[in-house]
Amino acid sequence: MTNMRKSHPLIKIVNHSFIDLPAPSNISAWWNFGSLLGVCLGLQILTGLFLAMHYTADTTTAFSSVTHICRDVNYGWLIRYMHANGASMFFIFLYFHIGRGIYYGSYSFMNTWNIGVLLLFAVMATAFMGYVLPWGQMSFWGATVITNLLSAIPYIGPTLVEWIWGGFSVDKATLTRFFAFHFILPFIITAMVMIHLLFLHETGSNNPSGMNSDSDKIPFHPYYTIKDILGVLFMMITLMSLVMFTPDLLGDPDNYTPANPLNTPPHIKPEWYFLFAYAILRSIPNKLGGVLALVFSILILMLFPILHSSKQRSMSFRPLSQCLMWMLVANLLILTWIGGQPVEHPFITIGQLASVTYFFTILILMPSTALMENKLLKW
């Protein structure tokens, strides 16, 4: 009699994905982030579900309902802050996961990579709509500013914005639909994650050397299951430390003031994980130009497989490309810092320089350096 794990139609899928999956023997801790993102997604859906049980998507009661969750619901404060800080963890891991993909050339798996970029867009949309739900000052003004960007689309822009708002300004209709979308999107994301994994398991995982690892594979369980559990342990320690000691560290104090359409906050800015894109948006004085730069700053990820010009897949043995990679990381950190600063003299120029450098590094410096490395290696 065959093992049920290998014969049962449903369990067989799980077995081929997480148990008997042949994995390269040399994948490092950088390969932990995929599973961590899965855990984060599960955690967000679970905490979000419990929050939705007590939240009311109405402009008059939304803010009070969040206060009620924190004060009156059993461990409501814990659920709320796990959800808010869980989103931050989610994005930290997302950026690490993408960075790993760029460094080790994982973008060569075109299908997996492109679904991944679409996943990034979906997660960003979900996070943006979630930030609107507490209906604080930054929620309201963030929603107003970001949705207004669509008015830059020629001809249909203004109509499109009013259609999204469900009226002539951000109001009750907007909040209700944002809640509906924020609830449904994580399930769509889960389906996309399954497709992401389906494509990945067609090719098998990449590894730090970037070379074919068919000759040296080990079963996913127990080797990488135990490694992933260790990663989850570190993640939970970090998340719970944030939640228990400094739950508002990554939030904005303005969001503790109920939304007031008659009073604009002095500095409208998104959550920290969007600041780099916000800095790129602000660095262009033209509205449509800024919106295009914002979209392209993420969409540019789809060009990586096309721009790859090295004979080697990974950057492990390419010191010049490594320098550029870390330059890009530093550049993104500078953009993140600038995104949180007011639009004043030194910051405007720094933001514009960092934005130009971001696109220049990816589109010109990285491919040309890879070609130079080929020449140096006489390839």
Swiss-Prot record:
Binds 2 heme b groups non-covalently. SUPFAM superfamilies: a domain/subunit of cytochrome bc1 complex (Ubiquinol-cytochrome c reductase), Transmembrane di-heme cytochromes. It is found in: Mitochondrion inner membrane. InterPro entries: Cyt_b/b6_C, Cyt_b/b6_C_sf, Cyt_b/b6_N, Cytb/b6-like_sf, Cytochrome_b, Cytochrome_b_C_euk/bac, Cytochrome_b_N_euk/bac, Di-haem_cyt_TM. GO terms for cellular component: mitochondrial inner membrane; respiratory chain complex III. It is a multi-pass membrane protein. A ubiquinone binds at residue 201. The keyword Coiled coil does not apply. One of its GO terms (biological process) is mitochondrial electron transport, ubiquinol to cytochrome c. The chain crosses the membrane at residues 33-53, 77-98, 113-133, 178-198, 226-246, 288-308, 320-340, 347-367. The keyword NADP does not apply. Keywords: Electron transport, Heme, Iron, Membrane, Metal-binding, Mitochondrion, Mitochondrion inner membrane, Respiratory chain, Transmembrane, Transmembrane helix, Transport, Ubiquinone. Its cofactor is heme b. One of its GO terms (molecular function) is metal ion binding. Its main location: mitochondrion. Heme b b566 binds at residues 97, 196. The cytochrome bc1 complex contains 11 subunits: 3 respiratory subunits (MT-CYB, CYC1 and UQCRFS1), 2 core proteins (UQCRC1 and UQCRC2) and 6 low-molecular weight proteins (UQCRH/QCR6, UQCRB/QCR7, UQCRQ/QCR8, UQCR10/QCR9, UQCR11/QCR10 and a cleavage product of UQCRFS1). This cytochrome bc1 complex then forms a dimer. Component of the ubiquinol-cytochrome c reductase complex (complex III or cytochrome b-c1 complex) that is part of the mitochondrial respiratory chain. The b-c1 complex mediates electron transfer from ubiquinol to cytochrome c. Contributes to the generation of a proton gradient across the mitochondrial membrane that is then used for ATP synthesis. Heme 1 (or BL or b562) is low-potential and absorbs at about 562 nm, and heme 2 (or BH or b566) is high-potential and absorbs at about 566 nm. Belongs to the cytochrome b family. This is Cytochrome b. It comes from Ctenomys sociabilis (Social tuco-tuco).
